[in-house]
Curated annotation (Swiss-Prot):
Keywords assigned: Nucleotide-binding
Family statement drawn from the similarity comment of this UniProt entry: Belongs to the YajQ family.
Species in which this protein is naturally found: Shewanella baltica (strain OS155 / ATCC BAA-1091)
CDD domains registered for this protein in UniProt: YajQ_like
GO cellular component: cytosol
PANTHER family on file: UPF0234 PROTEIN YAJQ
Keyword Nucleotide-binding in record: yes
Role, per record: Nucleotide-binding protein.
Official protein name in the record: Nucleotide-binding protein Sbal_0710
InterPro entries: DUF520 (IPR007551), UPF0234-like_C (IPR035571), UPF0234_N (IPR035570), YajQ-like_sf (IPR036183)
Length: 161
């Protein structure tokens, strides 16, 4: 019986490359010339530091653009609502969603069951296991998960026939 896992992961290598590209672009941007601005990556958290709040938002936009260039879904980003002001710099923390939260997993399972496809979906920790009789049913579930607006990107792992 074919089965697959629906997971939500961020490719760490591509994330680090996107942060490095953001640093490079920061060094060449005219509007950041002569300003104090920095991008730091540590433990799935990117810290953006700039002289004012507007520049922090520009850094978020640059990071989003670099992530999409590196094929990392920017919807996995969780940006702090308000920049933290300390001294003469503002800093924003950007976290990346890893794993599927139980609430989103329940919504995904309900969405799959409401689609009337002949598959079974079960929550297993931070992933959703889907089994069915036909490979076509699993591919339909993949399309359904991609189209769903649950606020989190999904990847498909462990596809077995």
């Amino acid at each position: 019986m074919p089965s697959m896992d629906i997971v939500s992961e961020v490719n760490e290598v591509e994330l680090r490359n996107a942060v490095d590209n953001t640093k490079r672009e920061l060094a060449t941007r005219f509007d950041f010339r002569g300003k104090t601005a920095d991008v730091e990556y540590k433990d799935h958290v990117v810290t953006l530091t700039a002289e004012d709040d507007f520049q922090c938002q520009q850094l978020v936009d640059i990071l989003r653009m670099q992530l999409s260039k590196r094929n990392v879904d920017p919807s996995s980003m969780e940006v702090d609502e308000k920049a933290i002001h300390s001294g003469k710099t503002f800093s924003l923390k950007v976290k990346f969603k890893e794993g599927i939260e139980t609430l989103i997993a329940k919504k995904l399972v309900k969405l799959i069951k409401d689609s009337k496809l002949k598959v079974q979906a079960s929550i297993q920790g931070e992933k959703v296991r889907v089994t069915g009789k036909k490979r076509d049913d699993l591919q339909a579930v993949m399309a359904l998960a991609r189209e769903s607006e649950l606020g989190q990107p999904f990847q498909f792992d462990n596809f077995k026939d």
